[in-house]
Swiss-Prot record:
Ranges annotated as biased composition (Polar residues): 39-52
Ranges facing Cytoplasmic side: 127-157
Recorded topology in the membrane: Single-pass type I membrane protein
Gene assigned in the entry: Pfs16
Compositionally biased region (Basic and acidic residues): 132-148
Pfam families xref list: ETRAMP (PF09716)
Disulfide bond annotation, renumbered to this chain: none
Top-rank taxon: Eukaryota
Protein name listed in UniProt: Parasitophorous vacuole membrane protein S16
Function: Involved in male gametogenesis. Required for exflagellation of male gametocytes. May play a role in parasite transmission in the mosquito. Binds to the mosquito vector midgut.
Amino acid sequence: MNIRKFIPSLALMLIFFAFANLVLSDANDKAKKPAGKGSPSTLQTPGSSSGASLHAVGPNQGGLSQGLSGKDSADKMPLETQLAIEEIKSLSNMLDKKTTVNRNLIISTAVTNMIMLIILSGIVGFKVKKTKNADDDKGDKDKDKDNTDEGDEGDDS
């Protein structure tokens, strides 16, 4: 194996692998970043309220029994219902982020496997080619040796 050609190609593959890993794992880093000082977090903790939009609605304060439409009654849901909806939304957002991270991990694993297979197939192919060339060279030397022996026998007669 020609080490002078193999080491630069291996170094190039490792640089490519590091670059692909950096690009594909960027989403994982973004998912773990905390919110900045100036911007509030978009995900609220379960049980927290966002201010004036959440207020307790008593049994006599609204709903379809007072002639309000379905849309108006949805705006005046009980506090427990609104908190449950907020919790479901936050869990949904968290699952979406985890799905994105998992998708990127699967893609990066697939890319890593392809790179390793390319490296291994290149090494195996190089060794097979080298042994085949060595066998061909050995066979050519044997043929040349046989031809010179036959040529010597033909000259004697």
